[in-house]
Amino acid sequence: MSAHIIDGNLLSQQLRQDVATRAAALSAKGKQPGLAVILVGADPASQVYVRNKVKACEDNGLFSLLEKYEADMTEAALLARIAALNNDPAIHGILVQMPLPKHIDPTKVIEAISPRKDVDGYSVLSAGELLTGLPGFRPCTPYGCMKLIESTGTKIAGKHAVVIGRSNTVGKPMALLLLQANATVTICHSGTADLGYHTRQADIVVAATGRRNTLTADMIKPGAIVIDVGINRDDNGKLCGDVDFAAAKEVAGHISPVPGGVGPMTITMLLVNTIEAAERETN
């Protein structure tokens, strides 16, 4: 029997209705939530991502400020612009689209964003808050993955979860969020011997490697929840994830597709974080 397909578009729409309601309530008090998005350079993929984020804001009652700069913008100029936005009361979240040109240090840029406005959840402070269980902004992609898992109705506590990937933006925070939900968590990566040994024991698998067919059907425990974070292209140029979806869906209990799974949820959780930032500022 085929797995239940976890529809990220549908869940995203449901969550965005709540975002729009909360945004309207804030706007009625004269406190419309505002997100500043900065794009440096003309990377085609980044332009698409930025356009989608701005449209999501506009569709759900948030104010968006899009600032585009040439690739030769200096690091000092970018840091100065972030400092100005930090002090702008109309802006509750600041997002600098990655990747940046090579002459700009991304860590410096992320750390320049006020912790109150770090709606991407990438700063060292945000990571520390997540690690210690303090309230803070969770990175949008892992946050969205958790919502997808929760939508299956599965009780996460006591389950064995395997996260494939250890990036600062997805793998590590994903493991921490699962740990907070009382799952038993294993982190696998490029240095892991016999990946399949670990994944076959997992009730929940999150694949976040950026490599096609990292997770194949024979590596999945029957009935497991499989969340595919990857964005890749197959031999025909068609969008695909890290999981061999066609075969995996015949073994898994629940599985997220690519596209239409994690992608829309990432932008939705950015909206949620921005709303939370505005609500904190207002309260």
Curated annotation (Swiss-Prot):
Domain of life: Bacteria
Disulfide bonds: none
InterPro entries: Aminoacid_DH-like_N_sf (IPR046346), NAD(P)-bd_dom_sf (IPR036291), THF_DH/CycHdrlase (IPR000672), THF_DH/CycHdrlase_cat_dom (IPR020630), THF_DH/CycHdrlase_CS (IPR020867), THF_DH/CycHdrlase_NAD-bd_dom (IPR020631)
Catalysis: reaction(s): (6R)-5,10-methylene-5,6,7,8-tetrahydrofolate + NADP(+) = (6R)-5,10-methenyltetrahydrofolate + NADPH; (6R)-5,10-methenyltetrahydrofolate + H2O = (6R)-10-formyltetrahydrofolate + H(+)
Amino-acid biosynthesis recorded as keyword: yes
GO cellular component assignments: cytosol
Enzyme Commission numbers on file: 1.5.1.5, 3.5.4.9
Keywords of the record: Amino-acid biosynthesis, Histidine biosynthesis, Hydrolase, Methionine biosynthesis, Multifunctional enzyme, NADP, One-carbon metabolism, Oxidoreductase, Purine biosynthesis
Pfam families named in the record: THF_DHG_CYH, THF_DHG_CYH_C
Signal peptide (residue range): none
Involved pathway(s): One-carbon metabolism; tetrahydrofolate interconversion
SUPFAM superfamilies on file: Aminoacid dehydrogenase-like, N-terminal domain, NAD(P)-binding Rossmann-fold domains
GO molecular function annotations of the record: methenyltetrahydrofolate cyclohydrolase activity; methylenetetrahydrofolate dehydrogenase (NADP+) activity
GO BP terms in the entry: L-histidine biosynthetic process; methionine biosynthetic process; purine nucleotide biosynthetic process; tetrahydrofolate interconversion
Residues annotated for NADP(+) binding in this entry: G165, R166, S167, S190, I231
Chain's role: Catalyzes the oxidation of 5,10-methylenetetrahydrofolate to 5,10-methenyltetrahydrofolate and then the hydrolysis of 5,10-methenyltetrahydrofolate to 10-formyltetrahydrofolate.
Quaternary structure and interacting proteins, as annotated: Homodimer.
Similarity field: Belongs to the tetrahydrofolate dehydrogenase/cyclohydrolase family.
Name recorded for this polypeptide: Bifunctional protein FolD
